[in-house]
A protein has these predicted regions:
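Short beta-edge/loop segments at beta->alpha junctions of small alpha/beta modules
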Residues: 2-97, 132, 194-215
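Hydrophobic alpha-helical interaction segments
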Residues: 2, 151-215
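Positively charged, aromatic-accented nucleic-acid-binding surfaces
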Residues: 86-94, 101-106, 164, 180
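Hydrophobic/aromatic-lined pockets within catalytic cores
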Residues: 41, 55, 110, 175-179
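A residue-level signal for conserved active-site and pocket-lining positions in enzyme catalytic cores
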Residues: 36, 105, 170
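Short amphipathic alpha-helical segments with coiled-coil-like heptad repeat character
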Residues: 44-46, 113-115, 178-182
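Exposed, interaction-prone assembly regions rather than primary DNA-binding/catalytic cores
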Residues: 98-152
């Protein structure tokens, strides 16, 4: 006997096809209600209703109020997907005046031996830490004068995020080791990438940030 499958098939109508195609052309899996309004030409209420239908059909996952992610078709009928957590962190931080820091930056620079359980982000604006689909996003409030020692890093083949450079990562870790798994983990990371570290830059950063551990 044939059983009814309660999960909806991931079919695309003309409007949803327009949205999906446009976002893919932009290499943009994460999107907001504002994006939907601009792409689909819908009013606010209609855009929200449209996105709700996409979530119900398994085409989109809601990450938080107003923030969504397209589900890759290769996931089949899976309906839960977050995408790359570093890109989610970038969007949560507003896309500017931020950088992935501490333990997350150590992971980006291959200074850890195992994946980090939380994503650490330093941002100028105060942000509340949150959990999305089991991943912790922890925000550290920074000052504008301390927004230096930052570089771009490829999160995927299409999208970059801002990450503290290796020397700034070490200094941040010495200043706040609790966000890196402890001072021992910072020391291990420094040893693992010792050939890439600039002693002169470490001292310069330490002076600017008033971190006496390096001195």
């Amino acid at each position: 006997m044939r059983q009814n499958n309660k999960k909806s098939f991931k079919t695309l109508g003309p409007l949803s096809a327009l949205l999906v195609t446009t976002l893919h052309e932009r290499s943009q899996l994460l999107f907001s209600i504002s994006d939907v309004k601009k792409i689909a030409g819908l009013a606010d209420a209609s855009a929200r209703s449209f996105v709700r239908s996409l979530v119900q059909r398994g085409l989109v996952t809601r990450l938080k109020p107003g923030l969504f992610v397209l589900l890759p078709f290769e996931l089949g009928r899976e309906t839960e997907y977050m995408g790359h957590p570093w890109l989610v962190a970038k969007v949560l931080a507003g896309g500017k005046d931020y950088y992935l820091s501490h333990g997350t930056a150590m992971e980006a620079h291959q200074m850890v031996t195992q994946p980090q359980l939380a994503v650490y982000v330093t941002a100028l604006k105060p942000l509340r830490s949150r959990s999305i689909m089991g991943t912790e996003f922890r925000f550290i409030h920074g000052q504008g004068k301390h927004l230096f020692g930052i570089e771009e890093h490829w999160a995927t083949k299409q999208e970059k995020v801002q990450v503290s450079d290796i020397d700034r990562t070490i200094i941040d870790g010495l200043k706040q080791p609790e966000y890196c798994g402890g001072i021992t983990e910072v020391a291990k990371g420094l040893w693992m990438q010792r050939e890439r570290v600039s002693p002169e830059r470490l001292v310069t950063y330490a002076i600017r940030l008033r971190v006496g551990a390096v001195m």
